[in-house]
Curated annotation (Swiss-Prot):
Family matches, as Pfam families: TCTP (PF00838)
Residue stretches in coiled coil: none
Its job: Involved in calcium binding and microtubule stabilization.
Keyword RNA-binding on entry: no
InterPro entries named in the record: Mss4-like_sf (IPR011057), Mss4/transl-control_tumour (IPR011323), TCTP (IPR034737), Translation_control_tumour_CS (IPR018103), Translational_control_tumour_p (IPR018105)
Subcellular location: Cytoplasm
Protein name: Translationally-controlled tumor protein homolog
Family designation: Belongs to the TCTP family.
Domain TCTP: 1-168
Lineage: Eukaryota, Viridiplantae, Streptophyta, Embryophyta, Tracheophyta
Length: 168
């Protein structure tokens, strides 16, 4: 299994269990999320509750909750929405922090192509949800989510050069 970590914070943000499609010259990975139901598991252990006097759930509050699989799996933390000005400020800080962490050709490609990726994201800002990794580290990678027209499940966008592949 491959896990993709944020180069800045080390937070796990994605794995190969979630296939991605490269867009914007490979600068952005697009991943389809899914709403799933978590909790409310009814376990039958073979006991006869009526014979044992335990017909009621005793103090168990096991509610079913709908979550987005990627957000739940990687414990992504949702951030407040932003306008274009705040978004540009945050993305510039991230680019400044990420660039020295990239090596040689990867760094050059990043410098040449990141502007196109930002221009791709900018018109979507009002429709995006913003997430960061579990540690909520300053200037770490942001994960963006939005709903394509007519979709009921969110699509996630990752800045690909900011991810480090780790074998588990």
């Amino acid at each position: 299994m491959l896990v993709y970590q944020d180069l800045v914070s080390g937070d796990e943000l994605l794995s190969d269990s979630f296939p991605y499609k490269e867009i914007e010259n490979g600068m952005i990975w697009e991943v389809e999320g899914k709403w799933v139901v978590k909790g409310a598991v009814d376990v039958d252990i073979g006991a006869n509750p009526s014979a044992e006097g335990g017909g009621e759930d005793e103090g168990v509050d096991d509610q079913a909750v709908k979550v987005v699989d990627i957000v739940d799996t990687f414990r992504l933390q949702e951030q407040p929405s932003m306008d274009k000005k705040v978004f540009l400020s945050c993305i510039k800080k991230y680019i400044k922090k990420l660039t020295p962490l990239l090596q040689g050709e990867q760094q050059e490609a990043f410098k040449n192509k990141i502007e196109g990726a930002v221009k791709y994201l900018l018109p979507k800002v009002k429709d995006l949800q913003f997430f960061v990794g579990e540690s909520m580290a300053d200037d770490s990678a942001m994960v963006f989510a939005y709903y394509k027209e007519g979709a009921t499940d969110p699509t996630f966008l990752y800045i690909a050069p900011g991810l480090k592949e780790v074998k588990c």
